Amino acid sequence: MPIITLPDGSQRHFDNPVSTLEVAQSIGPGLAKATIAGRVNGARVDACDLIEHDASLEIITTKDEVDGLEIVRHSCAHLLGHALKQLYPNAKMAIGPTIDSGFYYDIDLEQSLSQEDLEKIEARMVELAKTKYAVVKKKVSWQEARDTFESRGESYKMEILDENVARDDRPGLYHHEEYIDMCRGPHVPHMGFCQNFKLLNIAGAYWRGNSDNKMLQRIYGTAFHDKKALQAHLTRLEEAAKRDHRKIGKQLDLFHMQQEAPGMVFWHHNGWSIFRDLEIFIRQKLNEYGYQEVKGPLMMDRVLWERSGHWDKYADAMFTTSSENREYAIKPMNCPGHIQIFNQGLKSYRDLPLRMAEFGSCHRNEPSGSLHGIMRVRGFTQDDAHIFCTEDQIQQEVTSCIKMVYDTYTTFGFQNIVVKLSTRPEKRVGSDEIWDKSEQALIDSLKAMDIPFEIQEGEGAFYGPKIEFTLYDCLDRAWQCGTVQLDFNLPTRLGATYVGESNERLIPVMIHRAILGSLERFIGILIEEYAGFFPTWLAPEQAVVVNITDKQADYAHEVAQKLQKCGIRAKADLRNEKIGFKIREHTLKRVPYMLVCGDQEMEAGEIAVRTRKGKDLGKFKLDDFIAHIQAEIASRKLNLEE
């Protein structure tokens, strides 16, 4: 007789084992109709799974925008598999998980699928979903599952069973009419819940993410509970496509990538201008917050990476080379090098905290399939810093880091920042005392600044707790950028010590701190956030002077020269083209200000000022405009609306 406790504290008694769906039916037909799955004692289960003992139950319905939506999307992946096998019986199914905002399925198919094929597959999915067929779950033995997939020629499913499922386990097989898939679940009870979906695109993906394996075809899709939410998401995707940093990067001549240097950025003059302005801005912040800037070597001996522990855990992601019988690794991160600098010379407690920052050129051997413009690269620059401090200084230093993070992000216009605090995992280094002290210091720092945060229990690194800062952009996309990470491990491994007040040797606490993360990635985020309409202080070209006829050419040239002498990135466009053509061209280049010189302006020593959004600011004396734009640049005003 299971007793089921509901979220409101009420209890329901049943004479026999009962399913989530049956509990919902006992409450009311409306709830039963909306029931997707259940959460029994915190664990998700299918709506049909029987609850045999007393338990707490949360009923997952179509109103659940987290678990409910994830289950719908996962079931849509199975629906995609169902449609694919009907249309392409020889296709071999690999995996079909959910991802942020959607799902995908990897398949092995001899023919290359096109966009037209995608439309045909989606149409078949619509046909199948309209029937609202029941999804039947069967728990079977390992051998029965393997025999099922062997009889169907599903070699990838067999490999998953052989390598990832214990022989005494009972895998779940989900029957979608004649199609069978294997999954932990849960899934929707019927396809009536999978009515609002869209297939998006096709990409290549190596089986198990290993380039030594076969390249499969990956079909991406998305799904929502209702048409309105789906359409809103598709609209966001359309806007994101318009803002794609790769597309805008080409339009504005910022950078390019090429096959001979995968994952490495070729910065053009315009893009490098943005990069340098970011460096200047961060350097000002470093000075303001008391950091010293350093520069470590690009490449260090394998011995050092072995001592740091990176060689054992990170070797596959490191680029290596050898010379004179010594093996070297190009650095994937800056921290071991910073400890080498710290270790030069005796340090006293009076020297702490020591804040060390670097624009470190790092390289990581990311899989080729994961590379994405300048957002995911192999060569990147970290705005990295490491703070060496005592245990008693942790809170003040973390508070300073958090202030610097918010000071930086708000300058770029990011207001929606989600903060997560990850606490100690089961396997860790350091005493409970230092973990207690450190976690409390992070909590106190966030609370003192009135910053809401989410605690992720057990999600910290083995060497210390951390705070992560995730930005949400204008399209509500999440970008994890900033990190404040405590480290009780690396200083010990690499022999960092200082002399304490009692003349004893002590090991400093090390705080890893990144704000932008990778400058390359952050520039990509800014390109898409601003759609290329950079604030004037970041714009590669801040003003362009255009003449109406040849008669004003000399005057326009003089205006441009004066702007340049005042530190403004400006040029004169003296081409023999119509004024409308020139203004349109520079508008497309997102130049913040267009300064028009006609006869009247030339005679009065003025300029007619127009913004890239088409706003007429009227006529300015040149000195007045220079003062205006200099103030705008100096204050780093966003001027996105103009």
Curated annotation (Swiss-Prot):
Gene3D superfamilies: 3.10.20.30, 3.30.54.20, Anticodon-binding domain, Bira Bifunctional Protein, Domain 2, Threonyl-trna Synthetase, Chain A, domain 2. Residues 244-535 are annotated as: Catalytic. It comes from the Bacteria. InterPro entries: aa-tRNA-synt_IIb (IPR002314), aa-tRNA-synth_II (IPR006195), aa-tRNA-synth_II/BPL/LPL (IPR045864), Anticodon-bd (IPR004154), Anticodon-bd_dom_sf (IPR036621), Beta-grasp_dom_sf (IPR012675), TGS (IPR004095), TGS-like (IPR012676). Its cofactor is Zn(2+). The keyword Lyase does not apply. Residues 1-61 form the TGS domain. Zn(2+) binds at residues 335, 386, 512. Binds 1 zinc ion per subunit. Pfam families: HGTP_anticodon, TGS, tRNA-synt_2b, tRNA_SAD. GO terms for biological process: threonyl-tRNA aminoacylation. One of its GO terms (cellular component) is cytosol. It catalyses: tRNA(Thr) + L-threonine + ATP = L-threonyl-tRNA(Thr) + AMP + diphosphate + H(+). PROSITE patterns: AA_TRNA_LIGASE_II, TGS. It is found in: Cytoplasm. Keywords: Aminoacyl-tRNA synthetase, ATP-binding, Cytoplasm, Ligase, Metal-binding, Nucleotide-binding, Protein biosynthesis, RNA-binding, tRNA-binding, Zinc. One of its GO terms (molecular function) is metal ion binding. Its EC number is 6.1.1.3. Catalyzes the attachment of threonine to tRNA(Thr) in a two-step reaction: L-threonine is first activated by ATP to form Thr-AMP and then transferred to the acceptor end of tRNA(Thr). Also edits incorrectly charged L-seryl-tRNA(Thr). Homodimer. Belongs to the class-II aminoacyl-tRNA synthetase family. This is Threonine--tRNA ligase. It comes from Vibrio cholerae serotype O1 (strain ATCC 39315 / El Tor Inaba N16961). The gene is thrS.
